[in-house]
């Protein structure tokens, strides 16, 4: 760049001045892209851009120029809001997405909590099964006792009249014990209802 | 009051900074009060007083306050981050939008797996990409818009959305008035 035979950079061409070898614009505003410098010059001014670039290390100037070009384009497209319009729009998007995400996560949590009470219901069914089994065991005991005893009162063992009149007899005592054992599971079952 | 130049009123921050007389009708006076000298100093450093004068003269009076506030915001961002300026904030917000969109898509997929569909699950993706390569995260992150710079009146999106013409939503940028200007190579 610079010297006879080469084109001046886009900035020196626009400003109608000689492009020196150490021109600060030349590396970033090639002559084949005149619009790039024109828009930066319009929004920021050549002297301001020159000062900004001089204050930066050389390896950061390309990024600085690109961001200045972007901001200049935004300002020309929207003279009122410039880049702030884009920032405001993106901030709105972030807020909306955060709200939608919170709603979706809350629904997932509700579904997971709905699955947990179902397990408790299943547990309750198991408890009922145990009660039922206990009742069956007691019935088996009743049958065994009656069969072993060959008691003539088999058909009337549960009669309260029979129970009262035979209070002192050994078979009456056994019948009373069976009744007490049978009542326990019934009480236990009623607790679950 | 804003444009008075009698001895009872101070010159505006702009005329004080530029060491000139604050005339009646000074275009800066309504927006750069003398108690906010830093605001004009930033705008002058980044944009230049003559450029701002030209820009404001091209706007309608009721648009100038928003324009000055957005210029002040951008100037402050540029002073804080001389390399990336507002583009650093835009890149950061873009990454936030992408990350949140992915999380939302994953959550909606979970909901679909449970066999439930919600209004949010059917919502189409709403991400608009700027024509700019994401930059590294700036070392000094810009805070969200603070009350001083918050834009008054309707939001830019609401102002500009009805004026969009033609093209699908993906090609319409709500903050560029729907115009399809060709920008620089970015």
From Swiss-Prot, chain A:
Entry-linked InterPro entries: LOB (IPR004883)
Gene Ontology biological process terms from the UniProt entry: leaf morphogenesis; shoot system morphogenesis
Domain LOB: 7-108
Example GO molecular function: DNA binding
Domain of life from the UniProt record: Eukaryota
Organ and tissue specificity: Expressed predominantly in roots, and at low levels in shoots, floral stems and open flowers.
Further remarks about this protein from its record: Gain-of-function mutant pck1-D (T-DNA tagging) shows highly epinastic leaves, reduced apical dominance and sterility.
Similarity comment text for this entry: Belongs to the LOB domain-containing protein family.
Protein's name according to its UniProt entry: LOB domain-containing protein 12
Annotated gene: LBD12
UniProtKB/Swiss-Prot annotation, chain B:
Regulation: induction: Positively regulated within the shoot apex by both ASYMMETRIC LEAVES 1 (AS1) and ASYMMETRIC LEAVES 2 (AS2/LBD6) and by KNAT1.
All residue ranges annotated as the LOB domain in the record: 10-111
Sample GO molecular function, one term: transcription cis-regulatory region binding
Keyword Lipoprotein: no
One Pfam family, short name: LOB
Tissues in which the UniProt entry reports expression: Expressed in a band of cells at the adaxial base of all lateral organs formed from the shoot apical meristem and at the base of lateral roots.
Name listed for the protein in its UniProt record: Protein LATERAL ORGAN BOUNDARIES
Species lineage: Eukaryota, Viridiplantae, Streptophyta, Embryophyta, Tracheophyta
């Amino acid at each position: 760049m610079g010297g006879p035979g080469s084109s001046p950079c886009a900035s020196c061409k626009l400003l109608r001045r000689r492009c020196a070898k150490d021109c600060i614009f030349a590396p970033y505003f090639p002559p084949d892209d005149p619009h790039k410098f024109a828009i930066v010059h319009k929004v920021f001014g050549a002297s301001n851009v020159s000062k900004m670039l001089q204050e930066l290390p050389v390896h950061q100037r390309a990024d600085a120029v690109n961001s200045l070009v972007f901001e200049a384009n935004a300002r020309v497209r929207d003279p009122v809001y410039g880049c702030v319009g884009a920032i405001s729009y993106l901030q709105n998007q972030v807020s909306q997405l955060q709200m939608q995400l919170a709603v979706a996560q809350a629904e997932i949590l509700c579904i997971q909590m709905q699955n947990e009470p179902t397990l408790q219901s299943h547990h309750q069914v198991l408890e009922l099964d145990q009660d039922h089994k206990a009742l069956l065991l007691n019935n088996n005991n009743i049958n065994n006792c009656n069969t072993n005893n060959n008691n003539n009162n088999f058909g009337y063992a549960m009669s309260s009249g029979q129970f009262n009149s035979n209070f002192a007899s050994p078979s009456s005592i056994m019948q009373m014990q069976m009744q007490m054992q049978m009542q326990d599971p019934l009480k236990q079952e009623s607790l679950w209802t | 009051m804003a444009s008075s130049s009698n001895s009872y009123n101070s010159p505006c921050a702009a005329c004080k900074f530029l060491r000139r007389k604050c005339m009646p009708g000074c275009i800066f006076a309504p927006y750069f009060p003398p108690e906010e000298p830093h605001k004009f100093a930033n705008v002058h450093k980044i944009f230049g007083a003559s450029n701002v004068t030209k820009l404001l003269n091209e706007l309608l009076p009721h648009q100038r306050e928003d324009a000055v506030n957005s210029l002040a915001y951008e100037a402050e961002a540029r002073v804080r981050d001389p390399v990336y300026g507002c583009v650093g904030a835009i890149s950061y917000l873009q990454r936030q939008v992408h990350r949140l969109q992915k999380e939302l898509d994953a959550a909606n997929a979970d909901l679909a797996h449970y066999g439930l569909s919600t209004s949010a699950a059917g919502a189409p993706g709403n991400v608009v990409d700027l024509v700019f390569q994401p930059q590294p995260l700036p070392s000094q992150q810009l805070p969200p818009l603070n009350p001083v710079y918050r834009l008054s009146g309707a939001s830019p999106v609401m102002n500009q959305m009805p004026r969009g013409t033609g093209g699908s939503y993906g090609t319409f940028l709500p903050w560029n008035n729907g115009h399809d200007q060709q920008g620089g190579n970015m």
